[in-house]
Amino acid sequence: MAPDPIALARDLIRCPSVTPADAGALDRVQSVLEGLGFTCHRLPFQEPGTERVDNLYARLGDKGPNFCFAGHTDVVPAGDAAAWTVDPFGGEIIDGRLYGRGAADMKGGVAAFIAAVGSFLERNGPPAGSISLLITGDEEGPAVNGTRKVLDWMAAAGERIDACLVGEPTNPRALGDMIKVGRRGSLTATLTALGAQGHTAYPHLADNPLPRLAEALHLLASSPLDMGTPHFQPSTLALTSIDVGNPASNVIPARGTARFNIRFNDLHTPESLEAHIRDVLEEVGGAWELALQTSGVAFLTPPGALSDIVAAAVEAHTGRTPELSTSGGTSDARFIKDHCPVVEFGLVGASMHKVDENVAVADLLELTAIYRTVLERWFAGAEPRT
């Protein structure tokens, strides 16, 4: 019998799996998948200086092509539990809505796909190939011991995936609004202007770095990086902090540090953005320290067979024609795109990470039906491969 997506989602929400804790969530997933005939591999990883994270790769079938669903069972903290009107980890249903941390992002999506697989098998029997799931416990955290590591393990084990659907909550307002076919890149910069400390009464004996820092930030923030591309919005630069560490009003500081984040489209690379930043610093002059961290580069899965199948399934069940979008933040699709075509579709994300996170029960059931139709249409056109 196919699993009930509502019951499974409630079970998963009741596991307080705040990154890096698993709290039994993957045990529940594994138990249900093994009941459907999947072979499951638990894959814990731990980079030095990080927390140990558990992951799961499950596969049904030993032939290609291999259709993979990717997702995560870790969640962000509930925050102030007193601000919630329900237990954040209670999985309560009130007025047709399922409440709890992870309901939207993305335990609901995980439950819907597992239930969809069960329904697919009941209606169609074994697939003409394989179905797999890659479920991590490190999507909401540093993302160093999760999907990326599982993909490395899969490559070493000869596990090939031919298409991947990531179940992130992609819809802004209503189920069927949007499919993600790519993501912008993300680069965070820590910029420090260097000077010489001194007394404010004798500024000529000091070197105040703050005017230079202010000028550089103005130049960086006021000049558009681009005007966008056919598939991407314009790149953006957002200033996130300025720190001088100087509580005294009569002291010129020796340094000032700012942090900013750039969300960039496919016109840029981390290297080209670094060159742009350094050009601005050279224009302003003075001494600087610059540290950059890239959490993902821009990528696009060109519209094709996979996005067509998902879009057709969405329209068949919701009556909506989904927008193919690259908006929003990063996701683990940024790791998967190097292995196979990947698109993202899941629940409505309006309440994700918020107090009283919730989804419509009707949406969970409809998402399950959409996922089943995706599997049916994908395997209908699949050529079996040994």
From Swiss-Prot:
| Cofactor binding, note field | Binds 2 Zn(2+) or Co(2+) ions per subunit.
Residues given in the record as Zn(2+) 2 binding sites: 105, 140, 353
GO BP: diaminopimelate biosynthetic process; L-arginine biosynthetic process; lysine biosynthetic process via diaminopimelate
| Active site residues per record | 74, 139 (proton acceptor)
> Highest taxon of the source?
Bacteria
Q: In which pathway does it act?
A: Amino-acid biosynthesis; L-lysine biosynthesis via DAP pathway; LL-2,6-diaminopimelate from (S)-tetrahydrodipicolinate (succinylase route): step 3/3
Keywords recorded for this protein, A-Z: Amino-acid biosynthesis, Cobalt, Diaminopimelate biosynthesis, Hydrolase, Lysine biosynthesis, Metal-binding, Zinc
Q: Which cofactor does it need?
A: Zn(2+); Co(2+)
Q: Where does Zn(2+) 1 bind?
A: 72, 105, 168
Q: Which Gene3D superfamilies match?
A: Zn peptidases (3.40.630.10)
GO MF assignments: acetylornithine deacetylase activity; cobalt ion binding; succinyl-diaminopimelate desuccinylase activity; zinc ion binding
CDD domains named among the record's database cross-references: M20_DapE_proteobac
Q: What is its EC number?
A: 3.5.1.18
Report whether Acetylation shows up as a keyword of the record: no
Transmembrane feature ranges: none
Keyword match Lyase: no
| Recorded catalytic activity of this chain's protein | N-succinyl-(2S,6S)-2,6-diaminopimelate + H2O = (2S,6S)-2,6-diaminopimelate + succinate
Matches recorded under Pfam families: M20_dimer, Peptidase_M20
HAMAP family registered for this protein in UniProt: DapE
Give the family per the record.
Belongs to the peptidase M20A family. DapE subfamily.
- Oligomeric and partner information: Homodimer.
Q: What does this protein do?
A: Catalyzes the hydrolysis of N-succinyl-L,L-diaminopimelic acid (SDAP), forming succinate and LL-2,6-diaminopimelate (DAP), an intermediate involved in the bacterial biosynthesis of lysine and meso-diaminopimelic acid, an essential component of bacterial cell walls.
UniProt protein name = Succinyl-diaminopimelate desuccinylase
Species of origin: Rhodospirillum centenum (strain ATCC 51521 / SW)
Taxonomy of the source species: Bacteria, Pseudomonadati, Pseudomonadota, Alphaproteobacteria, Rhodospirillales
Gene name on record? dapE
